[in-house]
Amino acid sequence: PRKLLDELRSEYIKKIINPMITKEAKDLVDSHRKENHKLLIITATNSYITKPIADLLGIEDLIGTDLEEVNGEFTGKVSGLPSFQEGKITRLNLWLEERGLIFEELEKTFFYSDSMNDIPLLEKGSNPVAANPDEVLEKKAIKEDWPIIYLR
């Protein structure tokens, strides 16, 4: 039942996720906030799990994979386009369009990722950063001379 799932999620966020969020990660988010940058998390992980994490970081906007719900319960299916690989770019463009923005007209963009799955998104931005990168992304970052940071 959804009520139990909600309780388990809250406990997981409190006991597991919150302690994993490092001071360095919070400081990085705050540095962008101080520059008045628009903060957005784009993740392939489902929004049900990631929204509370975005809330912990004080980030209002989140694009995640949405879960289908019927009568307040999850069906086990995805709703809409998953935000995975190229789907992240499509979802980002839709999010921007809803706000009257066009990606190519943005003056400066920062993308942080740990996964090779995000290489298309990183290549699209003006300031790609590999954060705790997997092996493939690390090699790509070195080849492209992208910054590599570690937040754990």
Residue ranges, per PLM feature:
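C-terminal cap/substrate-recognition subdomain and adjoining C-terminal extension
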Residues: 6-10, 14-152
